[in-house]
């Protein structure tokens, strides 16, 4: 007798072992038709999985997130099937699920063209309509190697040869195609109805630039056509908002080959940067942080003591001078510990909060670089809090409150919080980890926020809270972190004198709110589509004259605004006013002031707000008050 507990708490009993598909059929024909897989005691399996002992079972359908992952994984295999069918000489490699879709890497003797993608997608649709059953078989490693070698698939054979000889290998087949995979997969190809191939890109075998270059075909797959259409519309909107395009259009920054992964900030872009940095500086100063500055280049010995040289060396830029090895800092924490160590600290000094807009450099691979989002040189709004064990909960509460307030000011109202818990390989005792994890839970509870827990995702030296902001397109970006560190203070000899005169290690909290300033500015630009709120806009107002007779008046207006701290420019060119308005509208300036003879004589201005909104004619003082209220509403 096999007892199966369902999600609603009910229990079904079966005389003999049953498959997930048979359980679904016993519940009802609708569920049997909808079943894509199952979860046996939390493990995702195929509908063909046999149940021969008492378990908890959930039937997975397209309504579940796991169901969508199964569909996308199976669609990746369908893509490989279609490519092999159309181009038999192509070799398959790997094809995982990624956010919003999947990809598959191929080795082929010529580049795939857009016309090829159309042809492949059409063939995928034809194969899906055949509704071929998907079968799974388990073989030994050596059997799998021999099979893929026999059909000329050297990449698959190489993958399997790297697997321990004692491991069993799962092979999935549909029609004339067989692939290596952990699974699970849909029961038949007819379940794959909504998909689209997106693009082709280059990739290296096993991600190593020393290996052969492959072709990566990206695709997306969904359970409903309307979901796919919404996603494709989002991509179109994202293309319009691309910070690289807007950076050029708005004259904010540029990048060039002579300095890969580094940013050339133009005047307006640097003005935007300064608004963000000065805002952050005010907020951390108000929160009791002490701003410091640490060297960009430090001796190898310090990086060895911190552990970075051993564990992060390949991502560090290094140099040599006078027979000494140095590294350009990839992060600020070792330098902050040096400031803490400079002098004897007492428990009365704690908590000590050190903040730095620290310039860091990391040797990211050239293929990973992406505009402002992934750079080699960046500035972090970094800070480290040195505190006692009794203080770290209150410090965590204060940080969470500050971070959530900052995100709201920048226009991010939806923030997801994740708590990464202890990994298998870790420093410290279970008791220490228990206190650390529970302390962070207590802090988040006190803040009234909800969070998702990620078992095993913490760093080896402590648990971490992550802050993921959602932008206007619903995309999630991890920005803030609060990382508890139980290792670095010991490695670098940080200590304080406790109340009983003993020497103790401080708790160290690494924290950032926006993270990389470059990346955050890229997110901001895309979130606001370049139309920054008035308090952030690099140019808040442009004053324009209609004719030369108003030049002096327009200049005086601009000067008056500038004295009030407004970021303003005067456009006095001998151009049609419609041309000027259009040009500055494309620059996404929040307010345009137009002056003609009537406005000059009445000492007023005609005001146009961004979006072409005519606010009418008003005295300059009235406009300044309106602008002030606009700025204060955001900040």
UniProtKB/Swiss-Prot annotation:
EC top class, as a word: ligase
InterPro entries assigned: aa-tRNA-synt_IIb, aa-tRNA-synth_II, aa-tRNA-synth_II/BPL/LPL, Anticodon-bd, Anticodon-bd_dom_sf, Beta-grasp_dom_sf, TGS, TGS-like
E.C. numbers: 6.1.1.3
Binding-site residues, Zn(2+): 333, 384, 510
Catalytic activity: tRNA(Thr) + L-threonine + ATP = L-threonyl-tRNA(Thr) + AMP + diphosphate + H(+)
Record note on cofactor: Binds 1 zinc ion per subunit.
Needed co-factor(s): Zn(2+)
Major location (coarse): cytoplasm
PROSITE patterns to which the protein is assigned, alphabetical: AA_TRNA_LIGASE_II, TGS
Subunit note: Homodimer.
Task of the protein: Catalyzes the attachment of threonine to tRNA(Thr) in a two-step reaction: L-threonine is first activated by ATP to form Thr-AMP and then transferred to the acceptor end of tRNA(Thr). Also edits incorrectly charged L-seryl-tRNA(Thr).
HAMAP family membership: Thr_tRNA_synth
Protein name according to UniProt: Threonine--tRNA ligase
Organism encoding this protein: Paraburkholderia xenovorans (strain LB400)
Gene: thrS
């Amino acid at each position: 007798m096999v007892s199966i507990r369902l999600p609603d708490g009910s229990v079904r009993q079966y005389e003999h072992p049953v498959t997930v598909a048979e359980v679904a059929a016993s519940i009802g024909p609708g569920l049997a038709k909808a079943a894509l897989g199952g979860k046996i005691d939390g493990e995702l399996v195929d509908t063909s999985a046999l149940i021969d002992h008492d378990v908890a079972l959930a039937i997975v359908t397209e309504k579940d997130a796991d169901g969508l992952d199964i569909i996308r994984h199976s669609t990746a295999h369908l893509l490989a099937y279609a490519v092999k069918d159309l181009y038999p000489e192509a070799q398959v490699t790997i094809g995982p699920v990624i956010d919003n879709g999947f990809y598959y890497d191929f080795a082929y003797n010529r580049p795939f063209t857009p016309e090829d993608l159309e042809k492949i997608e059409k063939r995928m649709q034809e194969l899906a309509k055949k509704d071929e059953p998907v079968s799974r078989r388990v073989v030994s490693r050596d059997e799998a190697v021999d099979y893929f070698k026999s059909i000329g698939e050297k990449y698959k054979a190489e993958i399997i040869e790297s697997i321990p000889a004692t491991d069993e290998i799962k092979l999935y087949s549909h029609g004339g195609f067989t692939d290596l995979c952990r699974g699970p997969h849909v029961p038949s190809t007819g379940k794959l109805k909504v998909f689209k191939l997106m693009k082709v890109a280059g990739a290296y075998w096993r991600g190593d630039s020393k290996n052969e270059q492959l072709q990566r075909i990206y695709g997306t797959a969904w359970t409903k056509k309307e979901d796919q259409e919404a996603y494709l519309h989002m991509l179109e909107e994202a293309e319009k908002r691309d910070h690289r395009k807007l950076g050029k259009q708005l004259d904010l920054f540029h990048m060039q080959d002579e300095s890969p992964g580094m940013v050339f900030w133009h005047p307006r872009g640097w003005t935007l940067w300064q608004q963000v940095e000065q805002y952050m500086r005010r907020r951390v100063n108000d929160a009791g942080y002490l701003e410091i500055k640490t060297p960009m280049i430090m001796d190898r010995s310090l990086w060895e003591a911190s552990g970075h040289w051993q564990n992060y060396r390949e991502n560090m830029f290094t140099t040599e001078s006078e027979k000494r090895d140095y590294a350009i800092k990839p992060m600020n924490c070792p330098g902050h510990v040096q400031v803490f160590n400079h002098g004897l600290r007492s428990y009365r000094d704690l908590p000590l909060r050190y903040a730095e807009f620290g310039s860091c450099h990391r040797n990211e691979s050239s293929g990973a670089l992406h505009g402002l989002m992934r750079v080699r040189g960046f500035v972090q709004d970094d800070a480290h809090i040195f505190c006692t064990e009794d203080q770290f909960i209150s410090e965590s509460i204060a940080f969470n409150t500050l971070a959530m307030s900052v995100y709201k000011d920048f226009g991010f109202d939806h923030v997801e919080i994740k708590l990464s818990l202890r990994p298998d390989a870790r420093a410290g005792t279970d008791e220490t980890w228990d206190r650390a994890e529970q302390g962070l839970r207590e802090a988040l509870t006190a803040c009234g926020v909800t969070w998702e827990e990620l078992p095993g995702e913490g760093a080896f030296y402590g648990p971490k809270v992550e802050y993921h902001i959602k932008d206007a397109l619903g995309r999630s970006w991890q920005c803030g972190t609060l990382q508890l560190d139980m290792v670095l203070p010991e490695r670098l000899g940080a200590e304080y004198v406790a109340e009983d005169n003993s020497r103790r290690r401080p708790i160290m909290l690494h924290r950032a709110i926006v993270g990389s300033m470059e990346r955050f500015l890229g997110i901001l630009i895309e979130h606001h589509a370049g139309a920054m709120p008035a308090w952030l806009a690099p140019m808040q107002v442009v004053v324009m004259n209609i004719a030369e007779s108003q030049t002096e008046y327009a200049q005086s207006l601009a000067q008056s605004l500038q004295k009030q701290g407004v970021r303003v420019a005067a456009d006095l060119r001998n151009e049609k006013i419609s041309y000027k308005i259009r040009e500055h509208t494309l620059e996404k300036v929040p307010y345009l002031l137009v002056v003609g003879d009537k406005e000059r004589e009445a000492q007023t201005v005609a005001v146009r707000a961004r979006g072409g909104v005519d606010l009418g004619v008003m005295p300059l003082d009235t406009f300044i008050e309106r602008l002030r209220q606009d700025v204060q509403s955001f900040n």
